[in-house]
Each structure stands twice: as structure tokens, then as C-alpha cells.
Amino acid sequence: MVVPALIYMFFNYDKPGLIKGWAIPIATDTAFVLGILSFFSRHISLELQAFIIGFTLIDDAFALIILALFYTKTINTPALLISSVIIFILFILNYRQVKQLFYYIIVGLLLWISMVESGIHGTLCGAIIALFIPVNIKGEFNTSFKKLENLTRPFVNYFILPLFVFMNSGILLEYFVFKGTCSNSILALVYGIIFGLFVGKQLGIMLFSYPFVKFKLCNLPSDTSWLKFYSISILGGIGFTLSLFIGSITFESSCPSNSMRAAVIIGSLISALFGVAVLKYCTSKE
């Protein structure tokens, strides 16, 4: 997350109107990365799968936190206090190991309303609710949790995610050709996002992982070479939906907004194609 943000800032440090987009390339689209890796499932060990899910979810969680902390324009203090009380109620439900989903749905709906009214983006609400739904109750797996997952997964995969992509990637093809006075003034925005996603993500993951393995603080996942691990780090540059979402909140005027969308799509596609090519090469040798 740090390296993509720094690369974006390098291109835009002297542009006050554009520097605020530093959070756009930090996110990883978990759904798209896992979708691509599903085609290579036979060659991806369980340990590597756990690492992939872990770093993509952590990326998304921090992106939501950054969204709440740095992209909130005004704070409604009374509504924020109400949100805090509702979160405490969720804590009590979890502590008492209440497994009925009805209570979490009702309390979650109230939390969403209060958070939106407080000025904090409502997307953070879903992450908070998920933290408090108990997975294990008295040492046994919570079947209600599994039912909720099974109930929402088709709806999310086949309706919410495609709709989200469609609504957030509404750009004209002409914006893929960066020309004209508008484009010239924000070319640094485009470079910052593309290089942040494609170069920043892989560089960040490798720079933070290699020293830990080198000094034996941790090990590579089983059946994983450095080249295969590198291919996963490249796929981390698929920002797509969450990057588009952060960008749409950051830039409201049409010129930077459309250029931002084109840059996110280009950076994500380059990361996907190059990552798949390297991963395909690795698996062909096995």
C-alpha cells in the first residue's frame, strides 16, 4: 500500500488539486484476483491461497479505513456518537455469542444509517458488521454465518459486483487517448495511477516480503518459487472496482474523473495480463 501511494505522490506532489488522489492505487480488487487465480487452482497451494486472500483483504480493509479518515468532508458528532453506541451493541451481541442473524441485520441497518448521517462513508459499515458476526460459538462453527455467506454470495457475485463495475467504469472510449488541454494538465494523474498499480504494488509486496524470507523471519508458501510469488505480486496491481470507487469520491469534476477511470482500467489490465503471463509460465514448468 505504501509504495503505490508514494509513486502516485512522486508524479503529483506539485499539483494540489491532484495529490489528494494518492489512495487510488493502494487498493486490490479481491474478487477479480481470486477469479483469475481460480483458473490456476491446481497450481496454487493452500498456504499461497491464504497469503493472497490475506493481503488482498488487508489492502481493502485499510483502503476503507483511509476512505473514512481522509475522505470524509464533514463530521456530524451526534450521529458519530450514535454509531459508537451501535458498534458497542454489536460487541455485546458477539460477546454473548448471539447467532441469530436477524439481530445483526437490524443493528447493522441502524449502524449504516447513523454512519451515513455522521459523514463517514457507509462502506465501512459492512466491514465493521463482519468483524462482529461470530464464526465460532462454543468451539463449534456458526452455521448461521455459513448460511449468510451462501445467501449473499450469488447476489454479490452476479448482481452487486457487475453493477458496481458498470456504474463506476462509465467512461467514453475517447478518454483512453490522453490528449487536449484537459488531459495535458492531469497527465501526471494518469501516470501516477498506472505506475502506482502496476509497478508500485509488485514492488511493495516484493520489497516487504523478500527481507523477511531472507532473514528467516518467515518462509515462502509451500510449493511456491520466487517467480510464482512475483506473479502474485503483479496481480496485486488489479485495483479496479475499489480504486474506481475511491477515485469517484476523490474527483468530482468530469475531466480528472474520466482520466482517472481510464488510468485505473489500464493499470489493472496491464497488471492482470502481465501477472497471468508470468503465472502461466511458472505453471507450464511444473
UniProtKB/Swiss-Prot annotation:
Q: Which InterPro entries match?
A: Na/H_antiporter_dom_sf, NhaA
Q: Report the Gene3D superfamilies cross-referenced here.
A: Na+/H+ antiporter like domain
* Keyword Membrane (UniProt): yes
Protein name per its UniProtKB record: Putative Na(+)/H(+) antiporter NhaA homolog
Record has Lipoprotein as a keyword: no
- Family the UniProt entry places it in: Belongs to the NhaA Na(+)/H(+) (TC 2.A.33) antiporter family.
Which subcellular locations apply to this protein? Cell inner membrane
Gene Ontology MF: a single term: sodium:proton antiporter activity
Question: Single Gene Ontology BP term?
Answer: regulation of pH
One cellular-component annotation, GO? plasma membrane
Q: Tell me the domain of life.
A: Bacteria
Q: How does it sit in the membrane?
A: Multi-pass membrane protein
Q: What is its main location?
A: membrane
Segments passing through the bilayer: 21-41, 50-70, 75-95, 101-121, 122-142, 158-178, 186-206, 229-249, 262-282
Keywords for this protein = Cell inner membrane, Cell membrane, Membrane, Transmembrane, Transmembrane helix
